[in-house]
Amino acid sequence: NRILDQVRTDYLMLIMPGQAIEPGQRAVERLLSVIDESGAGMVYSDFKDSVEGSLSDHPLIDYQPGSIRDTFDLGSMALLSMRAVRRAVKEYGAPREGLKWAAFYDLRLKLSLDSVILRIPEPLYTRIPTDRRASGERQFDYVDPRQRDYQIEMEEVATDHLKRSGAWLEPDFHPLPRAEGPFPVRASVIIPVRNRERTIKDAVLSALSQEASFDFNLIVVDNHSTDRTTEILSALASEDRRLIHLIPGRKDLGIGGCWNEAVFSDCCGEFAVQLDSDDLYAHNRVLERVIETFEERRYAMVIGSYTIVNFDLQEIPPGLIDHKEWTRENGRNNALRINGLGAPRAFYVPVLRQTALPNVSYGEDYSVALRISRYYEIGRIYESVYYARRWEGNSDAALPLATANRYDAYKDHLRTVEIAARKRMNHELGTENN
């Protein structure tokens, strides 16, 4: 706040803490030109990375209404319109005193309510990176217990933003719809798979070894594998009738589409429980534990906790991912700030059939979880019930920048749609109550 009070210019240039940069040719003039001509509240740009003397382009992604995560990457340099900043501070208040980490995040969110935050898709400076961890390592920063105080502060700021924008939801949940019975079994484990000959047998046996007080089956949606996966599944299915080996008629399916094939099939149970084709359940009572949790409060969805392991099932950092930041009072609101909700994910099928999953292979679970949480309560299991393998064949281990950008932009899009839907729902509820 002291900095904002002392600024006497029309614009304020921010260099992010801990960053070493070198502005490009006429970079400042370009930033000033764009912010002046567009009337934006803030502009930021792509840049170049300098690693061991070599330069490479580092494009960022566009800012959307759903770009409310505190980890949104603005790069190392941004230019703010002080006119827009003062207008936002007058309307919504300055960042509150006592914030240790979230002051700029708070200002950014307030600024975004009435002003455009605009990306310039040009590399206007060179940055020397200070965080060279793979994307697969950075994605778990928000569940690091060492960052708990930081995360609480960020959640408080994000919650205030959702309240200001009309998208915050009180902890009032809809009752579950009646089951569309009869279901062939109580629960179905669902595994979408393509070309996982090294791991699919382990995953299948992990599911079939479950001990439960109810009937269950395993639906493996084999997305036209070209290695030995299909052969392995056919052999396993011939030995255990609980294994249902589905090969879709379509050849354009992502992971979400494969899930839909299973969920809308006649062999799906009342509850559908996730198991990825290279992962394992942590013990043989996981299904029992999941269904018990569903029955505690009649949840529409239950999400467990998992441990990250290597191919040989040895725990590797960051270890347990338990999402203890979740609360009944604010979990579905904070879900709009963070990048994932955990695993394994399990669904009450009558609700899931109302929603379905988008036919993509990233963010499909986040999409359906956000929509379910808009109406229904989600239950949590905080002890580890799942092993998530990280190995050279795993798609989440280390993403190229272009892929990471595409994924982040897609999740911001999902948040944009969800925020709009929640604002509309709140508006309609307010109209009904008046």
Residue ranges of predicted features:
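Short, acidic, metal-binding catalytic loop of nucleotide-sugar glycosyltransferases
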Residues: 205-215
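Conserved donor NDP-sugar-binding/catalytic core segment of glycosyltransferases
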Residues: 20, 25-57, 285-318
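Acidic donor-binding loop at a coil-to-helix junction in glycosyltransferase catalytic cores
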Residues: 97-107, 361-368
